[in-house]
Amino acid sequence: MEIEIKVENIKNPPEKVRLMYEAVSQLLKGDRELSSIKVQDITQKAGIGKGTAYEYFSSKEEIIANALMFEYANKIALLVESAFKEKDFKKRCYKIMDWLCENKDYNMMFKHLFRMNAGLQAEPPMEKLEECEPGNFGYEAYQYVCQIIDEFMEDGYVQGAFTETDKRKRCLAILTAMIQYAVLITCQIGAHYEIMSDKEMREAVYTNMIKSLN
């Protein structure tokens, strides 16, 4: 099964929106907590006026959520394109884990996205996030990510790697597996995991994912 990944398939945001997305990325890579970031921080970093942000978004939560999704849509597109150079589904999954291991800064950004969606950010509470509807830019990026994952997992099914046919369950399985691996290598929780080598962690993560799909 052939797949053609083109990052330009994601709608290019207006220049000022792109600058805000880049500003959010830079702030989070600097170890800022989501709750500490203000709209003014974003616009100053982006080099635009504060009022400009509200021409495109209704809140800082909406800016951050869209920025994280757009960032990952682009990174995932490039990552899957690289992974598809491998013919074997398992090797493709390992390729993704290679990337996660080499790009821990993006793992931390994904942690922020996960916490926002799970409602775990509590200092201060970010209740407005749950009320945010997908914006034009973030929603298109979200749809693109879903399409990429669907095609990636369908190829695994065609290869006979698993038997699950439900696309939602496939998507949940691969995302859960990669989040699990990212947490293990990023947080470095301590002695409990020191008995496992990176090879053992990858094998365990992959094996558990396949079991959940059979």
Regions found by a protein language model. Name each.
Residues 39, 68-77:
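Short, basic, alpha-helical segments at the C-terminal edge of helix-turn-helix-like DNA-binding modules
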Residues 33-66:
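Helix-turn-helix
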Residues 66, 80-110, 171-172:
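Hydrophobic alpha-helical connector segments
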Residues 103-132, 183-188:
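Amphipathic alpha-helical segments used for helix-helix packing
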Residues 157-205:
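Hydrophobic/aromatic-rich alpha-helical bundle segments in the mid-to-C-terminal region
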Residues 1-45:
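Basic, helix-initiating cap at the start of DNA-binding domains
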Residues 76, 80-81, 120-159, 168-173:
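Amphipathic alpha-helical packing segments from all-alpha helical-bundle domains
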Residues 19, 23-31, 78-82, 177-185:
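Solvent-exposed, amphipathic alpha-helical segments
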